[in-house]
UniProtKB/Swiss-Prot annotation:
Protein name: RuvB-like helicase 1
Compartments where located: Nucleus
Coiled coil stretches, renumbered: none
Protein purpose: DNA helicase which participates in several chromatin remodeling complexes, including the SWR1 and the INO80 complexes. The SWR1 complex mediates the ATP-dependent exchange of histone H2A for the H2A variant HZT1 leading to transcriptional regulation of selected genes by chromatin remodeling. The INO80 complex remodels chromatin by shifting nucleosomes and is involved in DNA repair. Also involved in pre-rRNA processing.
UniProt keyword list: Activator, ATP-binding, Chromatin regulator, DNA damage, DNA repair, Helicase, Hydrolase, Nucleotide-binding, Nucleus, Transcription, Transcription regulation
GO MF: ATP binding; ATP hydrolysis activity; ATP-dependent activity, acting on DNA; helicase activity
Catalytic EC class: hydrolase
Length: 458
């Protein structure tokens, strides 16, 4: 029997994450927040504040400043940061990290902070390329005697004729380009382009003038290029300063045995020196002065900022004042607590008062019952779950009484229980059954403090 198998596409299935439904800040054109828009519900004042921050970032007037999103758990701090990144788009770098991410056995925490700082600073490099583009009308290699002797001949130059909509040119090319043309299997009638700086050659397709030549042909026909044969194209590349650091700290290549062994061995996480960063900053400054490059300060988002210790905050104090610094957005759900790395210094949000004085603080407030109901509806639509009105009321009650996270986590298990009971829609009894199966934090704590908690190790 002939084996036939179905080829599955390489399209990724998007996982429904906690903030998949957030598409932006949901602001009107005048900057005021709508009650419900772009997946956001409530938090009008916080969203409007973030809208002002986004405008400042776009105008590049916010670099080297800090914003703190402060509020209790489940009030939408991470969602606000994600919405800021959605509003800024892909052109402005957005680097999200968690406060505990910077602690490593291999690299200093200050080095990790600086690495993420430079990830959040983009560089827009403009490069002008000279390109010859057109339909090949002539392809003649010119041979010469082999300088090494013998009867063989070598290609000395290559004559190529290119035709575009506005004119025709005959070029004499280097023999190295002939190899590239052979690799691309270029023949007369093909449309190609050649980069003058690098000598790179690319076959675009067959000229559409030859489209009726054959009935059956797996050829892509393209029109003759418009304009002149010789063109100047401006190409814009977006890189981050960290990309430049890494490229210069680990130079590739080298034919000696040590270089070969170094490439085979497992790459160790190494620190990038301040001297190297200083040199890169000089080159970047030179490019900016020449008008070749443009600096794009992005956003560094540090979630759970209370996990940073006093040394990190001291380092951030200095880093924020440097001439090349991104916008730093912190998020913390702590009230008055001890600063990490100190014995008894208590401060608001677990952040030292001198650093807190540099921050613009955006507070988030707990959601009301009506807002929680709306969020449950949005999440049920996002997760593709059908819920009855009575069940939504029941789930929203849990959101008010227990926590928003707990009530949203009940949606998917409740849909599985509903299917097991032969229903397509989640009902109140499915939510009640889910509540019995899965404890919330307060019920679990009450269980441990009661007689039933004696079996646990203290």
């Amino acid at each position: 029997m002939v084996q036939i198998s179905e080829v599955k596409g390489n399209k990724r299935d998007n996982r429904t994450a906690a903030h998949t439904h957030i598409k932006g800040l949901g602001l009107k054109s005048d900057g005021y927040a709508e009650k419900q828009a772009a997946g956001f519900v409530g938090q009008a004042a916080a969203r409007e504040s973030c809208g002002v921050v986004v405008d400042l970032i776009r105008a590049q007037k916010m670099a080297g400043r800090g914003v703190l999103l402060a509020g209790g758990p489940g009030t939408g701090k991470t969602a606000l940061a994600l919405a800021i990144s959605q509003e800024l788009g892909t052109k402005i770098p957005f680097c999200p990290i968690v406060g505990s991410e910077i602690y490593s056995a291999e690299v200093k925490k200050t080095e990790m902070l600086m690495e993420n700082f430079r990830r959040a600073i983009g560089l827009k490099v403009r490069e002008t390329k000279e390109v010859y583009e057109g339909e090949v009308t002539e392809l003649t290699p010119e041979e010469a005697e082999n300088p090494l002797g013998g009867y063989g001949k070598t290609i000395s130059t290559l004559l190529i004729g290119l035709k575009s909509a506005k004119g025709q040119k005959k070029l004499r090319l280097d023999p190295s380009i002939y190899e590239a043309i052979q690799k691309e299997r270029v023949t007369v009638g093909d449309v190609i382009y050649i980069e003058a700086n690098t000598g790179a050659c690319k076959r675009v397709g067959r000229s559409d003038a030859y489209a009726t030549e054959f009935d059956l042909e797996a050829e892509e026909y393209v029109p003759i290029p418009k304009g002149e044969v010789h063109k100047k194209k401006e190409i814009v590349q977006d890189v981050s300063l960290h990309d430049l650091d890494v490229a210069n700290s680990r130079p590739q290549g080298g034919q000696d045995i040590m270089s070969m062994m170094g490439q085979l061995m497992k790459p160790k996480m190494t620190e990038i020196t301040d001297k190297l960063r200083g040199e890169i900053n000089k080159v970047v400054s030179k490019y900016i002065d020449q008008g070749v490059a443009e600096l794009v300060p992005g956003v560094l988002f540090i979630d759970e900022a209370h996990m940073l210790d006093v040394e990190c905050f001291t380092y951030l104090n200095r880093a924020l004042e440097s001439p090349i610094a991104p916008i730093v957005v912190l998020a913390s759900n702590r009230g008055m607590c001890t600063i990490r790395g100190t014995d008894d210094i208590v401060a608001a949000h677990g952040i030292p008062s001198d650093f807190l004085a540099r921050m613009l603080i955006i507070p988030t407030t707990p959601y009301e019952a009506d807002e929680i109901k709306r969020i449950v509806r949005i999440r049920s639509t996002t997760e593709g779950v059908s819920v009855s009105d009575a069940a939504i009321d029941k789930i929203s009650e849990h959101g008010v009484r227990i926590s928003l996270r707990y009530c949203l986590q009940l949606l998917t298990p409740a849909s599985i229980l509903a299917k097991a009971n032969g229903r397509s829609q989640i009902d109140v009894q499915d939510v009640a059954e889910c509540e019995d199966l899965f404890l919330d934090a307060s019920r679990s704590a009450a269980l441990l403090s009661s007689e039933a908690g004696r079996g646990y190790l203290a």
